């Protein structure tokens, strides 16, 4: 899900450790890509159709990653869904979350991994990386089929506690 739009973020405190950025700056973003950064970008020099965001006194940074989220779906949708959990993550500045396998059924096979991916694509607003179970049912007795889950792009495993 590639972001779209044309935004000029004015006067924000730009922080990006990967780029060694820590200064006040304007940032021009087009379709999810930073195209220009610098002080006092001239709005008159830009093509039409951008939205200006006043970030005075605010921090501008790349999206955060939550490596330990509990989305509760499937099985506990009365607590949270992939849609509601990813919306909350986005509101907090997170662009990627890893969801723990303490669902019902647990994320211990390829069909549940695929369910998470499919639901995240259809209902989610941030990237979701499911964390699969180390053992079937999170019971600690028999290893889950990690090779099968990896074939569905599963990157991590854990037999996470319930909360």
Residue spans for each PLM region:
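Conserved residues at the C-terminal ends of beta-strands
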Residues: 15, 100, 134
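Metal-associated gating/positioning segment near the N- to mid-region
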Residues: 56-123
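Histidine/acidic residue-rich metal-binding segments in metalloenzymes
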Residues: 144-154
């Amino acid at each position: 899900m590639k972001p779209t739009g044309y935004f000029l973020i004015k006067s924000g405190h730009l922080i990006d450790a990967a780029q060694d950025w820590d200064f006040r700056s304007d940032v021009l973003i087009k379709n999810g890509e930073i195209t220009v950064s610098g002080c006092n970008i001239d709005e008159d020099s830009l093509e039409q159709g951008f939205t200006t965001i006043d970030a005075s006194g605010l921090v501008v940074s790349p999206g955060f990653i939550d490596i330990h989220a509990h989305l509760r779906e499937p099985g506990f949708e009365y607590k949270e869904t992939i849609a509601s959990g990813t919306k909350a993550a986005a509101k907090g500045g997170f662009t990627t979350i890893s969801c723990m396998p303490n669902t019902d059924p647990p994320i211990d096979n390829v069909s549940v991994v695929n369910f998470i991916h499919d639901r995240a694509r259809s209902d989610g607003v941030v990237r979701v990386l499911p964390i699969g179970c180390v053992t079937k049912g999170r019971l600690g007795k028999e290893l889950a089929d990690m090779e099968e889950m990896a074939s569905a792009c599963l990157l991590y495993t854990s037999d996470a506690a319930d909360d």
